[in-house]
From Swiss-Prot:
It is found in: Cytoplasm. Heterotetramer, composed of two GyrA and two GyrB chains. In the heterotetramer, GyrA contains the active site tyrosine that forms a transient covalent intermediate with DNA, while GyrB binds cofactors and catalyzes ATP hydrolysis. Keywords: ATP-binding, Cytoplasm, DNA-binding, Isomerase, Nucleotide-binding, Topoisomerase. InterPro entries: HATPase_C_sf, Ribosomal_Su5_D2-typ_SF, Ribsml_uS5_D2-typ_fold_subgr, Topo_IIA, Topo_IIA-like_dom_sf, Topo_IIA_B, Topo_IIA_B_C, Topo_IIA_bsu_dom2. Its EC number is 5.6.2.2. GO terms for molecular function: ATP binding; DNA binding; DNA topoisomerase type II (double strand cut, ATP-hydrolyzing) activity. The lineage of its organism: Bacteria, Pseudomonadati, Pseudomonadota, Gammaproteobacteria, Moraxellales. This is DNA gyrase subunit B. Its main location: cytoplasm. The keyword Magnesium does not apply. SUPFAM superfamilies: ATPase domain of HSP90 chaperone/DNA topoisomerase II/histidine kinase, Ribosomal protein S5 domain 2-like, Type II DNA topoisomerase. Coiled coil: none annotated.
Length: 388
């Protein structure tokens, strides 16, 4: 009975709706030493629940046939089923789930003993990670079970997934809020205790701390409340302090016990803060230039008359002398010329803040028109579709 306290169905209706939308639904239930059977047709019971034998098994077998009267297509997607069953196996360590597709003689077994640790490992496959996976499970005094696994990698995207009673919340909620608060506090305390912020002379934000982070948050809540019937956001107020308290305790201990991992994570955060600050300065630089120059374009750029990017070409030439020759020989209607100093900067090896401080790189950014930074970069604003 305890397992049902933290179970969740499809929008709270589950098998009731499956039954109503099926031309046939057949139940076999093994319980308390007996096997029971019942069958429905288009939602109507064909006979009362009956005992058909004795058993030492425990469990339920449900078979259903979708109604062609309701659905124009009744073909099941094995890819969708596989994705959800894999997710459920990660969320319930040690539970063995078998997916069979008898149409093509396909079978796959999902059985992940590592639970959320293996979930994070699966998501981060092929990426360079900065720390070993941090993973904890705890039962709080409020009766809420909290499980978290996380790892940083060298990418720039945050990938945090939230679940309540095995149900995903794509819009997060109170469990995500508690996690973020504890994560930011723990990292800030570490950075301050190691005097890193003063040494590096930077201010970090929560976004900086979560750059490159992959995390799974799973809570088991006896009576969860959601913002809508689709359960895409958890709003139970008691979950935030439960997650925050558990995460704060476990994560602070992890940073103290794993100094090398903590140092790598701190380095990633500092780089993210510098990049964010450099992007802000670049945006300000571009805006100042736009205010001074009506066209908002670099002074050395000889622009073309064509306004359609698909028909416009930009030629990058080395130095002012080459720029002069190129301007004389170009087709003014569709060809723009931008002179640049030779070998401006190897941006592959340069840190973002150094790259953005280069005048030539700034000129390129302004000329291309795409903007810079996570909030403002838009490749659709590219002013030339052919760059030579």
């Amino acid at each position: 009975d305890n397992s049902y306290k933290v179970s969740g169905g499809l929008h709270g209706v589950g098998v009731s709706v499956v039954n109503a939308l099926s031309k046939k639904l057949h139940l076999i239930i093994h319980r308390a030493g007996q096997t029971h059977e019942q069958e429905y047709c288009h939602g109507d019971s064909q006979y009362p629940l009956k005992v058909i034998g004795e058993t030492d098994k425990s469990g339920t077998v449900i078979r259903f046939w979708p109604s062609e009267l309701t659905f124009s297509q009744t073909i099941f997607s094995v890819e969708i089923l596989a994705r959800r069953l894999r997710e459920l196996s990660f969320l319930n360590a040690g539970v063995r789930i078998v997916l069979r597709d008898e149409r093509v003689n396909f079978e796959h077994v999902y059985d992940y003993e590592g639970g959320l640790s293996e979930f994070v490992k699966y998501i981060n496959e092929g990426k360079t990670h900065l720390n070993e996976i941090f993973h904890f499970t705890t039962d709080t005094d409020s009766g809420i079970a909290v499980e978290v696994a996380l790892q940083w990698n060298e990418s720039y995207q945050e990938n945090v997934r939230c679940f309540t009673n095995n149900i995903p919340q794509k819009d997060g909620g109170t469990h995500l809020a508690g996690f973020r608060a504890a994560l930011t506090r723990g990292l800030n305390q570490y950075l301050e205790s190691e005097n890193i912020l003063k040494k590096e002379k930077v201010a970090v934000t929560g976004d900086d701390a979560r750059e490159g982070l992959t995390a799974i948050i799973s809570v088991k809540v006896p009576d969860p409340k959601f913002s809508s019937q689709t359960k895409e956001k958890l709003v139970s107020s008691e979950v935030k302090p439960a997650v925050e308290q558990a995460m704060n305790k476990e994560f602070s201990a992890y940073l103290l016990e794993n100094p090398q991992a903590a140092k790598s994570i701190a380095g990633k955060i500092i780089d993210a803060a510098r990049a964010r600050d450099a992007a802000r300065k670049a945006r300000e630089m571009t805006r100042r230039k736009s205010a001074l120059d009506i066209a908002g374009l670099p002074g050395k750029l000889a622009d073309c008359q064509e306004k359609d990017p698909a028909l416009s070409e930009l030629y990058l030439v080395e130095g002012d002398s080459a720029g002069g020759s190129a301007k004389q020989g170009r087709n003014r209607k569709m060809q723009a010329i931008l002179p640049l100093k030779g070998k401006i900067l190897n941006v592959e090896r340069a840190r973002f803040d150094k790259m953005i401080s280069s005048q030539e790189v700034g000129t390129l950014i302004t000329a291309l028109g795409c903007g810079i930074g996570r909030e403002e970069y838009n490749p659709d604003k590219l002013r030339y579709h052919k760059i030579i």
